[in-house]
Every structure is written in structure tokens, then in C-alpha cells.
């Protein structure tokens, strides 16, 4: 049974325009994952988070947010051979074109490898909506 995921973006620029975008996407399944990523400053080590069991192209909406952001919070997609990226703010992607920024056929968005050297534990929340496996 399909589930409707609605979202709304409000963009307000001081002394400039305000833009509101709303949309919805139908997904077959969704997961909400919350993980505590321990600080590994003394010996940087990634925490592996299973995001979804599907192949490339199954994700329709993705939200990644944290209680702390910065250059010392980094992630990789799929495995440790992919590019390391900095989690310096929340990530919200919807649609194949946007999600292609993070995944490709050789590196599906099935896992996130998160390395935390911020000096304290960090809580990361991931919401993923996808088509059936």
C-alpha cells in the first residue's frame, strides 16, 4: 500500500523574495533511522548505517539531519571507496535527478558511513522513502 509523503520548503531572503514550494511523493515503504554516532577523534572510525535494502534508483525521498554539523562530521555512500563528504547542514533530496547527486550504479545509497570527530557524540536522523524492494 502506497504512503503519501508531503513536504514544504520555505525560502525567505531578507529584503528579497520569499518562495514556498510544496509537493508530495508516493512511496511503497519508508524508514526512520536514528543513530548515535560516537566521537572517534583519537582514532577516526566510521559508523555504518544501513539506509535501505534496495538497488540503485529505489529511493524517492531522503532526509539526513543531525543535532550537530560541521567539517568534523563526514560521510560516505555505500563503502569506504567513495568520496568523503562533509555533513555541514541538513540534506533533503527528492526525485531521481536530485538523488543522483549521492548515488550511482557502482555506489548505491544502501549504506552511510559516518565519521564523527567533533569532540562529542552526534545524533543523526535519516528518513528514507522508497519503492518496494
Can you name each region flagged by the protein language model?
Residues 28-47, 87-90, 94-97:
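Solvent-exposed, conformationally flexible loop/turn segments
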Residues 82-109:
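Intrinsically disordered, low-complexity Pro/Gly/Ser/Thr-rich segments with frequent PxxP/GP/PP motifs
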Residues 57-67:
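A short beta-strand element within beta-rich, extracytoplasmic domains
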Residues 17-22, 37-56, 118:
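Surface-exposed ligand/attachment interfaces on beta-rich extracellular proteins
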Residues 65-87:
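Short, surface-exposed beta-strand/strand-loop-strand elements in extracellular ectodomains
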Residues 103-123:
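Noncatalytic modules at the cell exterior or secretory-pathway interfaces
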Residues 1-20, 26, 116-133:
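C-terminal interaction-tip segments
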Residues 60, 71-73, 120-124:
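Short beta-strand/loop motifs in extracellular/secreted proteins, especially
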Amino acid at each position: 500500500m502506497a504512503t503519501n509523503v508531503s513536504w514544504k520548503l520555505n525560502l525567505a531572503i531578507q529584503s528579497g523574495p520569499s518562495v514556498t514550494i510544496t509537493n508530495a511523493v508516493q512511496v511503497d515503504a519508508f524508514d526512520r533511522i536514528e543513530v548515535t554516532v560516537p566521537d572517534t577523534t583519537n582514532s577516526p572510525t566510521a559508523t555504518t548505517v544501513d539506509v535501505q535494502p534496495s538497488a540503485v534508483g529505489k529511493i524517492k525521498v531522503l532526509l539526513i539531519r543531525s543535532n550537530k554539523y560541521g567539517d568534523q562530521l563526514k560521510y560516505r555512500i555505500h563503502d569506504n571507496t567513495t568520496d568523503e563528504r562533509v555533513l555541514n547542514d541538513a540534506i533533503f533530496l527528492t526525485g531521481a535527478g536530485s538523488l543522483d547527486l549521492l548515488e550511482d550504479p557502482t555506489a548505491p545509497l544502501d549504506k552511510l558511513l559516518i565519521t564523527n570527530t567533533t569532540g562529542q557524540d552526534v545524533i543523526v536522523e535519516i528518513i528514507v522513502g522508497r519503492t518496494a524492494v
